[in-house]
From Swiss-Prot:
Residue ranges annotated as intramembrane: 2-12
Membrane-spanning ranges: 22-42, 72-92, 157-177, 206-226
Localization of this protein: Cell membrane; Cell junction, Gap junction
Known function: Structural component of eye lens gap junctions. Gap junctions are dodecameric channels that connect the cytoplasm of adjoining cells. They are formed by the docking of two hexameric hemichannels, one from each cell membrane. Small molecules and ions diffuse from one cell to a neighboring cell via the central pore.
Organism: Gallus gallus (Chicken)
Ranges in the topological domain labelled Cytoplasmic: 13-21, 93-156, 227-400
Protein name: Gap junction alpha-8 protein
Superkingdom of origin organism: Eukaryota
GO cellular component, one term: connexin complex
Site (Cleavage): E368, G369
Amino acid sequence: MGDWSFLGNILEQVNEQSTVIGRVWLTVLFIFRILILGTAAELVWGDEQSDFVCNTQQPGCENVCYDEAFPISHIRLWVLQIIFVSTPSLVYFGHAVHHVRMEEKRKEREEAERRQQAEVDEEKLPLAPNQNKGNNPDGTKKFRLEGTLLRTYILHIIFKTLFEVGFIVGQYFLYGFRILPLYRCGRWPCPNLVDCFVSRPTEKTIFIMFMLVVAAVSLFLNLVEISHLILKRIRRALRRPAEEQMGEVPEKPLHAIAVSSIPKAKGYKLLEEEKPVSHYFPLTEVGVEPSPLPSAFNEFEEKIGMGPLEDLSRAFDERLPSYAQAKEPEEEKVKAEEEEEQEEEQQAPQEEPGVKKAEEEVVSDEVEGPSAPAELATDVRSLSRLSKASSRARSDDLTV
């Protein structure tokens, strides 16, 4: 039958990268198929054609009848079955080896980068002894079925299942599941219907049933492995959202921070201080009593409540009303003083004699102040020249 050691060595490596059920399947393949096929089955079918005897002397009739009874030998059919069933495993093994090599190269690159980083860290800060022994020095490979490797594994199981079913169905249509001791043949060049006899029919039937049971067990293991992987994938997909929900930490609402409670460092200012101030008169902070708001400023406040603050620069003057009104009384006072000075200059030459008399009377009244109580009731003093210019009571009406 030849040497099966090459295929056995490859399948042993596939065994390292399979699931538990896949390893059981490989055990069934090795022990109950390859081993039995290489030892016992060859001896049973060794004399198959030589012991096939027909009751005719017609040349070639016996060979034609054997070809009709056994279009392909059982042993060769089972060898083809083993090869076809093992081919998906070989394809998966090639992909797994490629995946493992790529992972090894990636780990080597990461290890090189880690060593370079460790050397840089040692130059900056030397490590304590036994600190960098956390990594696994053995480099043991932890095999995991995930991603493309898992998909390849499932596909190779599906193809194995299809090949198993195909060979079982093919064997049934070729031979059936029993070997009859008598086979009737009427194929040309046989002169008539010829009786042919098969050697060891019972023993061959037992081997056929045994190999059929092994194929059924292999098919069952394939179906169980596919179901196991699919259920495992579904459970992982259902478990992932629950883990994500458990891993999510509920966010606590951030409380508002009062700006006044934050200590401000010297030379820095808080961004919250740039918000618009709630009052408009900075003089109140110094202790000056604020004056009542003018009508224009009331309109300003009403317009603030009506619209957004962005349009204030367009609707109103940029100057605050308080500062604008603080300058207007000063200008009015200066103008009033200038008008009074002009009136005084015009009336000065006309009122000089009267003013002198009034001043003399005032001086005499002051000298006689305690002795003239009757004159205090009625003030007959003439108005000063400044009092004539304005009707308001002024502090400089009396000259001391």
